[in-house]
Amino acid sequence: MTNYAIILAAGKGTRMKSDLPKVLHKVAGISMLEHVFRSVSAIDPEKTVTVVGHKAELVEQVLAGQTDFVRQTEQLGTGHAVMMAEPVLENLTGQTLVIAGDTPLITGESLKNLIDFHINHKNVATILTAEADNPFGYGRIVRNQHDEVLKIVEQKDASDFEQQIKEINTGTYVFDNARLFEALKNINTNNAQGEYYITDVIGIFRENGEKVGAYTLKDFDESLGVNDRVALATAESVMRRRINQQHMVNGVSFVNPHATYIGVDVEIAPEVQVEANVTLKGQTKIGAETILTNGTYIVDSVIGERTVITNSMIEESSVADGVTVGPYAHIRPGSSLAKDVHVGNFVEVKGSSIGENTKAGHLTYIGNSEVGANVNFGAGTITVNYDGQKKYKTIIGDNVFVGSNSTIIAPVELGDNSLVGAGSTITKDVPADAIALGRGRQINKEDYAKRLPHHPQNK
């Protein structure tokens, strides 16, 4: 049978106290809405309709081209939100999943199980439920002696007996598509909130003697709806635990998984060692047998095998096999480090390519440069790439030796096998195999220091 999905993403999220629409707040690096959409994709819906409202344009940008959008200009409840999808889904045959966009922990596996349960039991509606240790505040699932769902009763309306029920409504449902939109025509706003409730549809089905079922989640965490920053932090914690556990199952070692942040799209090969306080974000990929030490931060970068990154930052760059970086190095966007490069402490690389086996051990800036293989940068080397208006490129060939405290002012090229003397300021090209000395000649004035007031003999 054909599946459809409706994602409810129109709410403002007042309790978040944010200008950002609630569903766009991030968990593990992507928005809650994206988490929900990815999970919904597991049921392979023929059509997905996302209901937007508050700051609709921002929400639509996140899933542009991936879903149909309809707008709920007035926030008149969950039932009203689902009504907005009628022009897209009416008269279609199949079952429709209705899910809130602020439930980032729900998994695709659970949604597939929900759909299968709905079909196998020939229900007109199926409620996704969970068993809560503390059900206070949730709608309760009331069943009869045959374990059939009778109704959903809200906390404020529940009797003393009903308040003892642990099974709660998660706010996710599957409906026979045609019957859903027929029933929506019969709900009203005769309630304390003056809104159209999707739960009223369940009551209509029961009154008609139609079959309503409930599928219970195995993991209560999946039911979490995020309405404030406290719940957002809870979702982040649960998602981080899931992600790290999966990496450990796949052969990655964590010194302290509770103090490690790995984004949902990060890929890590087996035999990688991750120490505490490491952050990996975006589309980062880490190769096998790499070591990431305490405090390392990597975003949208590809790291090769057998590399060692020590307490350093790497952004939007590529690092090949056998490279060592840090401590306290910064590899900025647009950089690439070839095999066996060493970038040491307090070295910054920006928008540059560095060839195999090149070494910049300490206190060096390499910007907008193309550096060959087997180059050695002495301590304090600076490529000067900016004149206040434009940035210029430095080209350094293979097997070049740059002495300490040298300043290389771009645009300039150092030829293969050339050598720059320590303390030089280079403003012109250096031919291959040449030695460049760009510093003032040293002059020694004998006994001149004795004339100075601080000399020992003058005290």
Curated annotation (Swiss-Prot):
It catalyses: alpha-D-glucosamine 1-phosphate + acetyl-CoA = N-acetyl-alpha-D-glucosamine 1-phosphate + CoA + H(+); N-acetyl-alpha-D-glucosamine 1-phosphate + UTP + H(+) = UDP-N-acetyl-alpha-D-glucosamine + diphosphate. Its EC number is 2.7.7.23, 2.3.1.157. Catalyzes the last two sequential reactions in the de novo biosynthetic pathway for UDP-N-acetylglucosamine (UDP-GlcNAc). The C-terminal domain catalyzes the transfer of acetyl group from acetyl coenzyme A to glucosamine-1-phosphate (GlcN-1-P) to produce N-acetylglucosamine-1-phosphate (GlcNAc-1-P), which is converted into UDP-GlcNAc by the transfer of uridine 5-monophosphate (from uridine 5-triphosphate), a reaction catalyzed by the N-terminal domain. GO terms for cellular component: cytoplasm; membrane. In the N-terminal section; belongs to the N-acetylglucosamine-1-phosphate uridyltransferase family. In the C-terminal section; belongs to the transferase hexapeptide repeat family. It is an enzyme of class 2 (transferase). Pathway: Nucleotide-sugar biosynthesis; UDP-N-acetyl-alpha-D-glucosamine biosynthesis; N-acetyl-alpha-D-glucosamine 1-phosphate from alpha-D-glucosamine 6-phosphate (route II): step 2/2; Nucleotide-sugar biosynthesis; UDP-N-acetyl-alpha-D-glucosamine biosynthesis; UDP-N-acetyl-alpha-D-glucosamine from N-acetyl-alpha-D-glucosamine 1-phosphate: step 1/1; Bacterial outer membrane biogenesis; LPS lipid A biosynthesis. It comes from Streptococcus sanguinis (strain SK36). One of its GO terms (biological process) is cell morphogenesis. This is Bifunctional protein GlmU. Keywords: Acyltransferase, Cell shape, Cell wall biogenesis/degradation, Cytoplasm, Magnesium, Metal-binding, Multifunctional enzyme, Nucleotidyltransferase, Peptidoglycan synthesis, Repeat, Transferase.
